[in-house]
Regions:
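Conserved beta-strand signature within the Rossmann-like core of class I S-adenosyl-L-methionine
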Residues: 183-191
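Conserved class I S-adenosyl-L-methionine
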Residues: 194-204
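Conserved SAM-binding loop and adjacent beta-strand
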Residues: 29-31, 49-65
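Glycine-rich S-adenosyl-L-methionine
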Residues: 156-181
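N-terminal auxiliary segments of SAM/dcSAM-dependent transferases
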Residues: 1-37
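Conserved SAM/SAH cofactor-binding pocket of Class I
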Residues: 57-144, 150-154
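Short "lid" loop at the C-terminus of a central beta-strand within the Rossmann-like core
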Residues: 148-149, 166, 191-195
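Class I S-adenosyl-L-methionine
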Residues: 205-252
Length: 254
């Protein structure tokens, strides 16, 4: 319990009290951080920290592992890196120059720890930035996996799940073209779960892609396999049973 609280709150010089539910959340996060989550696409574990989205459902990572890379592909950016898992998959594919960004100090610390465990710190650089790094250099591949639900987060820990008014999704799509090399690709990972809940229209993402001056080169789809898909008692079962996660490979529409 002491370790769990220290990881979230840091060193405290005074006594304090916590709601039991909050304490249990800290302890649960500590256990996940300690044992890690096995990522099939890496054949290794990723260790999430408290408040950083845990890649428990890793089907989308298999898409990143197998999708055709741009040619050439000398550099890649991972926008909103979180645990760093996407950067790790790209590094495993052989990319030597990867730049990973996030706004959250917890996520940056988490990603750094995972990169050190995986021995890829020479391949990946971390930058604290809102979406794109401040650099004049363009990238051959820019990957983003924004939160999938366009709703307001009630707590900081929910920011990895909810993207209020689709701000991150829109910010990525409408600005990524200025950061791509001439033959580069932008990869968007997005579930249609929000569509099945009536929170997003089926045309919203294609319309954003067109507005951004991009076109779809290829689209890879995968159906989730996590246990909630089979749980008929789940209030969201119907939407989960229909859900598809897609990797949109986008290029400049020239």
């Amino acid at each position: 319990v002491v370790d769990a609280c220290f990881e979230v709150l840091g060193a405290q010089t005074e006594r304090y009290a916590l709601p039991l539910r909050q304490l249990l959340a800290y302890v649960s996060a500590h256990e996940w951080r300690k044992k890690g989550v096995l990522i099939a696409a890496l054949n290794s574990n990723i260790h999430p920290h408290y408040g950083v989205f845990s890649p428990i459902s890793g089907e989308y990572l298999e898409l990143i592992k197998s999708a055709s890379l741009p040619n050439p592909c000398a550099s890649a950016w991972d926008i909103g890196t979180g645990t760093g898992v996407i950067s790790a998959v790209l590094a495993k594919r052989g990319l030597k120059t990867i730049l990973a960004t996030d706004t959250d100090p917890r996520a940056l610390a988490c990603a750094q720890e995972n990169f050190e465990r995986l021995g890829i710190t020479e391949q990946v650089q971390l930058h604290q930035a809102d979406l794109f790094p401040k650099t004049d250099t363009k990238a051959d591949l820019i990957v983003c996996n924004p939160p999938w639900l366009p709703a307001k987060a009630a707590a900081p820990i929910e920011r990895a799940i909810f993207d209020e008014k689709s701000q991150m999704l829109k910010g990525f799509l409408l600005n990524v073209s200025t950061h791509l090399s001439a033959y580069g690709q932008a990869w968007l990972i997005m579930s249609d779960f929000a569509e099945h809940l009536g929170l997003r229209t089926p045309n919203e993402i294609p319309d954003l892609i067109e507005r951004a001056g991009l076109r779809v080169l290829k689209k890879y789809d995968v159906r989730p396999k996590h246990s909630k898909v089979l749980d008929t008692a789940d209030a969201l079962h119907t939407a989960r049973a229909l859900e598809t996660t897609s990797l949109w490979c986008l290029v400049l529409d020239t």
